[in-house]
Amino acid sequence: MELGLKKDEVKIVPYNAQWKSEFERVKKLMLHVLNVNESQIEHIGSTAIKGMKAKPIIDILLGVENLQCIDRILEKALYSIGFYRLRVERENEVVFAKFADEGFETKTHFIHAVKFNGKIKKNLIFFR
């Protein structure tokens, strides 16, 4: 399965049914290390839409009660399964990424942590 993009790289690839399996695999890992319900983790973005061409990056939504609860414990838990908090500044969203290489050049997964019942979550789910 082709997965990942380098910084500033743009690539659209044909739909791959393995994207769903990869999301499910990562979701299980997240459920194992985080104190969240299954309903708080969802596959979003173009790889979540069956049959659609997409950028080969798995986007995952993590719904939290509030963004202030994203503390060192949650960051360490996500780090333990290979995710790094990005310095991306987005209002009402914290972004984590997983990389395919030790040089942190090729991103394969994003976790978008947003308020569980907030507007951003609704917009991200609506796209799907």
Question: PLM ranges: what are they?
Answer:
Residues M1-K55, V64-E75, Y79-R128:
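Catalytic core of pol beta-like nucleotidyltransferases
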